[in-house]
UniProtKB/Swiss-Prot annotation:
Organism whose genome encodes this protein: Streptococcus equi subsp. zooepidemicus (strain MGCS10565)
Residues annotated with N5-methylglutamine modification: Q236
Start and end residues of each stretch annotated as Disordered: 288-308
Assigned protein family: Belongs to the prokaryotic/mitochondrial release factor family.
Broad class of where this protein is predominantly found: cytoplasm
Keywords: Cytoplasm, Methylation, Protein biosynthesis
Pfam family of the protein (one): RF-1
Composition bias, Basic and acidic residues: 293-308
Source species, domain of life: Bacteria
Name this protein carries in UniProt: Peptide chain release factor 1
Secreted keyword on record: no
Length: 360
């Protein structure tokens, strides 16, 4: 099926959906009505663009016919040629637009995310860099009008981050931050380095779409839930009532501990959000690993341990190794201005997918 057959099939389905949504039997079935409404909304832009494209094709045919029938009238011929030129330019623009609209939509693109950052190789310096990344994502979220909530964090003795888990909520969060998963390498002179030598350290970032309970159901029998007293600095118990929660998903041994909130229920709710996302992500990663051909068409290898980016402080340089992008503005990027990198990654991903579509 070529691209135009696909577009015609989308339009046919759109018209069918319009009829179904006016059917009293469908209207009375709330669940089905909502599902069909969502499907119709997701194809509306594509259908509108395709109809405009067909109108442009008709304009080309009309202009060519007018040139043939001009009968030597230079004014009519010139006007028709100008219309033909404009219509052909519009045709090219709409062909590119339609190809993009036909690309498979990532069903997670509109979702909120669970963001995890960990200091990895490099000890204290890695933990300090993890803190820099946390601040970078917080500032980027603020610039996008998103809500950024730290759900759980553990720090080392110098104020660096061993591990932090955050929820980022807002419009199209996953679509912009999904490319951030991987190993982020930093090259700089640590404050504790007396010889001025540049050290290399690493922090890892994991971005997972938030998973609602209705989307991914975990069997309660697969969970072990422990309740214990929250502890403060030095390990002392800070609550007389046991409010901290530990949840273990037994089949995968994925574990989440939560003690940030004052009540057991709030800690349990947050822990369930994280474990649901982690378990769903775990099985999604297994499925992705089994689809080698699909992985080759995405940015990077898909390996969570893959080094995706280097932040070189002496050269004020950031390099994204997956797309060969180098920017001499590290200070700007760490201040939360990630748009240039995000836009380049989205464009690269779309280009790769367009090539796959054209090769079909």
């Amino acid at each position: 099926m070529n691209i135009y057959d696909q577009l015609q099939a989308v339009e046919d389905r759109y018209e069918e959906l319009g009829e179904l949504l006016s059917d009293p039997e469908v209207v009375s079935d709330t669940k089905r009505f909502m599902a069909l409404s969502k499907e119709e909304a997701s194809t509306r832009e594509t259908v509108a663009a395709y109809r405009q494209y067909k109108a442009i094709i008709q304009s080309i045919d009309d202009a060519e016919e007018m040139i043939k029938e001009a009968g030597g009238d230079p004014d009519i011929e010139e006007m028709a040629k100008e219309e033909l030129k404009e219509a052909k330019a519009a045709k090219e623009t709409y062909e590119d637009k339609l190809k993009l609209l036909l690309l498979p939509k990532d069903p997670n693109d509109d979702k909120n995310i669970i963001l995890e950052i960990r200091g990895a190789a490099g000890g204290d310096e890695a933990a300090l860099f993890a803190g820099d990344l946390l601040a970078m994502y917080q500032k980027f979220a603020e610039s996008q009008g998103w809500r950024f909530e730290v759900m759980e964090a553990s720090y080392n003795g110098v104020g660096g981050i061993k591990e932090v888990v955050a929820m980022v909520s807002g419009q199209s969060v996953y679509s912009k931050l999904k490319y951030e998963s991987g190993a982020h390498r930093v090259q700089r002179v640590p404050v504790t380095e007396s010889q001025g030598r540049v050290h290399t350290s690493t922090a890892t970032v994991l971005v997972m779409p938030e998973v609602e309970e209705v989307e991914y159901d975990i069997d309660p029998k697969d969970l072990r839930i422990d309740i214990y007293h929250a502890s403060g600095a030095g390990g002392q118990n800070v609550n007389k009532v046991a409010t901290a929660v530990r949840i273990v998903h037994l089949p995968t041994n994925i574990k989440v501990e939560m003690q940030e909130e004052r009540t057991q229920q709030k800690n349990r709710d947050k822990a369930m959000k994280i474990i649901r996302a982690r378990v769903a992500d775990h099985f999604a990663q297994i499925a992705q690993d089994e689809q080698d051909a699909e992985r080759k068409s995405t940015i990077g290898t898909g390996d969570r341990s893959e080094r995706i980016r280097t932040y070189n402080f002496p050269q004020n340089r950031v390099t994204d190794h997956r797309i060969g992008l180098t920017l001499q503005k590290l200070d700007t990027i760490l201040s939360g201005k990630l748009d240039e990198i995000v836009d380049a990654l989205v464009l690269y991903d779309q280009t790769q997918k367009l090539e796959s579509l054209n090769n079909q």
